[in-house]
Structure formats: structure tokens, C-alpha cells
């Protein structure tokens, strides 16, 4: 690859890293072309970009963004990078699911919001709720609270009426 092409790739990778909410490094050695295409399709369906890039070029892109020290340990052997633009957790779910049936795919590490997660954290990351799921749960909790307030007020009023009715009966 010529120098100007390498510089272009470094710029593209740096731009993708800058836009990403989550960056995942995987080792794909041993995956055949069909399995790699299947994995890319899974990522594509979720709006995730998955690229095979030379380790040195990824490292140069990380240096431009002052993040090389965080992910440099994962840049060994064959590396492919998953860029999670909208949901930083979605790549972890796909990697975990795919690696259950394809042992050749290995999770190396991830960086989400500046925090680096090692290869032992894939299960934890994949079990986390996505941003959309968290918003949905929060909205559901708020809705439950709002809908239960009138019921509580009605119960208090019903109890008060019952007490007043019993007091009135005792006075008769």
C-alpha cells in the first residue's frame, strides 16, 4: 500500500473512531470468507461498521486522537474493528452471539466513552441494556408512578369515607 493510501486510511479510521460511541477490537483469524460475510451482515443490520485494518494504521489513527495508550494492547495479530455509532453496546451483543457458534472470532477489547474493557468483559458488556432500552425502562417507571398516584389518592379518599361512615353509624 502506498503512503498516500495509508494516510487516507488513517484519516478514515480516525474519523470513524471520532464518530463512534463504542469501538470493539476483534481477532478474526480462522474465519472463512462466508463466515466473515455473515458477521459483516449482522453488524450492518445493526448499523455497525466492521473493518479489517492494519494494526499500525489503527494505532496511527488512535495517536491522532490521543487514545493510542488505551487500545494499543489489543492491536496484535489479525484485527478487525467494529464501530458502534448509535449504540455502543450492540457490537458486544453481536460479537458474543456470533462467537458462540464461531470460535475463530475472538473479542480483544472495547472502548466506550473513554473507558477500556478487556477481553474478560464481553459477557458484561453484552448483557448491558442499550440506551434505547434504558430510556424505555425509565419511561415505563415514570408512567407507572404517574398512573399509580390517582389510585393512591382514591384509596385514601375511600378509606376516609369508610371511616366517616363508621363514625356516623356509631353515633346513631
From Swiss-Prot:
Gene3D superfamilies: 3.30.70.1730, 6.10.250.290. The keyword Ribonucleoprotein applies. The keyword Ribosomal protein applies. Keywords: Ribonucleoprotein, Ribosomal protein, RNA-binding, rRNA-binding. PROSITE patterns: RIBOSOMAL_L10. One of its GO terms (molecular function) is structural constituent of ribosome. GO terms for biological process: translation. Pfam families: Ribosomal_L10. GO terms for cellular component: large ribosomal subunit. InterPro entries: Ribosomal_uL10, Ribosomal_uL10-like_sf, Ribosomal_uL10_bac, Ribosomal_uL10_bac_type, Ribosomal_uL10_CS_bac. Forms part of the ribosomal stalk, playing a central role in the interaction of the ribosome with GTP-bound translation factors. Belongs to the universal ribosomal protein uL10 family. NCBIfam families: PRK00099.1-1. Part of the ribosomal stalk of the 50S ribosomal subunit. The N-terminus interacts with L11 and the large rRNA to form the base of the stalk. The C-terminus forms an elongated spine to which L12 dimers bind in a sequential fashion forming a multimeric L10(L12)X complex. This is Large ribosomal subunit protein uL10. It comes from Chlorobium limicola (strain DSM 245 / NBRC 103803 / 6330). The gene is rplJ.
